[in-house]
């Protein structure tokens, strides 16, 4: 699957564990990179729902059209589907603390 990034910092963090660790902290940065590996290895968006460990789920309200997958604890990787073979990484956040 092709991945687009909402920001250059998110793109840089996807290339380097050092960058990911500086941006998110090491445990979250490591999971971020692992999730990108899964996304790149997946052919179609709908296949992501078969990966139970991702806990991919749609968001509601102002985030309608966006999806979240678990990184660690309350931290989620927020994505949106662009096409069946293309996603955009929007953010990594603890949206439960809002």
Annotate the PLM regions.
Residues 3-4, 52, 85:
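Residues that recognize and position ribonucleotide moieties
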Residues 1-36:
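Arg/Lys-rich, positively charged N-terminal/basic patches that mediate binding to nucleic acids
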Residues 66-98:
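Enriched for short, Lys/Arg-rich terminal
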Residues 14, 40-43:
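Hydrophobic residues in alpha-helical segments
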Residues 31-34, 40, 51-54:
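Generic alpha-helix structural propensity
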